[in-house]
């Protein structure tokens, strides 16, 4: 006769439904070897991270996981993320639960207990979620009963001020990783971004090379010419990308065009030039496949995009271009070069520009080519 004893003090038990081991494998509590007793020890913490988006921000925020596991080795970590950005967290060995914001989050927060809630977002939805976890220690940002933002320490307060005043953002000299590490009280700020590579995706990437007759010995320059839907001004000139592609094609390198559906216009325009050895990686890749194709590259040229954070996390050399957003905020871990436009109004954080030549147009292809040649 089965024994239906419930270990309600197990970290894996979600309270209102079967745990994953019971649901997927039919394992009973009495026979389960995954039992983890809830403990109040310093090491064994239940941690909730709230970082909904954007996708690049979610990806670069994964660096905090190293520090959290260093501080709390036996911790259980859950992450609330916007459903459209969840793919960058999948297969991350440090995350026990990925919760998307299309679920019943209020019910989830009421029925699950956390020792620490880390909210790195200032969006109202994120602040409200942190507020619902009122029995936990909140690091980062939450709301008080009067809907005022509460910053957990002086570093969080300064980040809040930079979010409200572009002048402060422009004068910032520290990376995002530095600020978040201080907000979360991590031992250091140079933990790496985590970009999981899946075996199946890597195999598909190698098949992509074989299909296109690309030898493994060939040096590959990845070019991500887009900048997403929101920040059109972060794009470099199409002429600059074409000149750069032509230069490295003549040198015998492979140029791999990287991007998603939103980058098809730029990618197709470059392909129309019929430059030898310039190939599209495709614009309909899964996130896992996209990561694996970035991993094929020796050096990546891009703007301030998700592809940048992925390339950095994969320890690629990057040459990255900046105009309306902060060059100082971006961490590349001493692997590559950052190039900034030449305008007094640089780091304006505007999404529209009425100047005849905007800041990104002041970046010359020769400067970019010279930078890439240091690594390729």
Show where each model-derived region lies.
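Catalytic machinery of carbohydrate-active enzymes
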Residues: 1-376
């Amino acid at each position: 006769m089965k024994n239906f004893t419930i270990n309600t003090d197990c970290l894996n038990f979600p309270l209102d439904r079967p745990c994953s081991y019971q649901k997927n494998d039919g394992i009973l509590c009495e026979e389960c070897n995954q039992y983890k007793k809830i403990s109040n020890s310093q090491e064994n913490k239940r941690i909730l991270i709230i970082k909904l988006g954007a996708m690049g921000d979610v990806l670069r925020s994964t660096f905090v996981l190293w520090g959290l596991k260093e501080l709390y080795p036996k911790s259980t970590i859950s992450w609330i993320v916007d459903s459209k950005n969840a793919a960058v967290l999948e297969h991350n060995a440090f995350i026990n639960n990925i919760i998307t914001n299309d679920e019943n989050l209020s019910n989830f927060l009421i029925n699950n207990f956390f020792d620490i809630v880390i909210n790195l977002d200032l969006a109202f939805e994120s602040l409200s979620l942190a507020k619902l976890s009122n029995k936990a220690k909140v690091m980062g940002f939450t709301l008080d009963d009067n809907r005022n933002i509460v910053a957990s320490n002086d570093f969080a307060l300064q980040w809040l001020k930079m979010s409200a005043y572009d002048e402060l953002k422009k004068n910032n000299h520290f990376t995002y990783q530095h600020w978040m590490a201080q907000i979360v009280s991590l031992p250091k700020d140079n933990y790496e971004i985590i970009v999981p590579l899946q075996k199946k995706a890597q195999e598909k990437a190698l098949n992509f090379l074989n299909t296109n007759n690309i030898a493994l010995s060939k040096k590959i320059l990845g070019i991500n010419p887009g900048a997403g839907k929101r920040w059109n001004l972060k794009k470099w000139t199409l002429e600059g990308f074409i000149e750069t592609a032509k230069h490295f094609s003549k040198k015998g390198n492979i140029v791999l065009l990287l991007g998603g559906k939103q980058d098809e216009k730029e990618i197709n325009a470059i392909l129309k030039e019929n430059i030898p050895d310039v190939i599209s990686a495709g614009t309909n890749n899964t996130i896992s496949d996209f990561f694996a194709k970035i991993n094929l590259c020796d050096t990546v040229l891009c703007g301030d995009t998700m592809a940048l954070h992925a390339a950095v996390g994969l320890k690629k050399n990057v040459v990255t271009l900046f105009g309306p957003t902060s060059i100082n905020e971006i961490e590349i871990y001493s692997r590559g070069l950052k190039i900034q436009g030449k305008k007094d109004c640089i780091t304006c954080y505007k999404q529209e520009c009425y100047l005849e030549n905007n800041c990104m147009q002041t970046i010359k292809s020769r400067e970019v080519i010279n930078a890439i040649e240091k690594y390729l």
